[in-house]
Amino acid sequence: MAWALLLLTLLTQGTGSWAQSALTQPPSVSGSPGQSVTISCTGTSSDVGSYNRVSWYQQPPGTAPKLMIYEVSNRPSGVPDRFSGSKSGNTASLTISGLQAEDEADYYCSLYTSSSTF
């Protein structure tokens, strides 16, 4: 049975020159149990390309967001190692290997700088 991992982009406007920045995610990604999926988060050379402070959050329906990855590729304690993060150029990615039913959720990327969060 296939099920979708639904994605939304977390956008929190900053201030000054950062106020117009935004991160772009695909509208949805789907996979079947056991498969691997990669979710992209694309910015620009001024944000994602310049900072290693990309985080990923998982939000199952009706629950609060949970931090899954911070600083591009670091996993907090308790997050399974089948979740991994990476970055190439202006695009950060979250890869989920060996999909499980409980992985069905919204996934958000976020970028933190010293003055702004996107």
From Swiss-Prot:
Record's compositionally biased regions (Low complexity): 24-38
Disulfide bond annotation, renumbered to this chain: C41-C109
Span list, region Disordered: 20-52
Quaternary data: Immunoglobulins are composed of two identical heavy chains and two identical light chains; disulfide-linked.
Region (Complementarity-determining-1): 45-53
Statement: the UniProt record of this protein carries the keyword Cell membrane: yes
Protein name stated in the entry: Immunoglobulin lambda variable 2-18
Keywords: Adaptive immunity, Cell membrane, Disulfide bond, Immunity, Immunoglobulin, Immunoglobulin domain, Membrane, Pyrrolidone carboxylic acid, Secreted, Signal
Annotated stretches, region: Framework-3: 74-109
Polar residues composition-biased segments: 39-52
Modified residues (Pyrrolidone carboxylic acid): Q20
Subcellular localization: Secreted; Cell membrane
Renumbered residue ranges of the record's region Complementarity-determining-3: 110-118
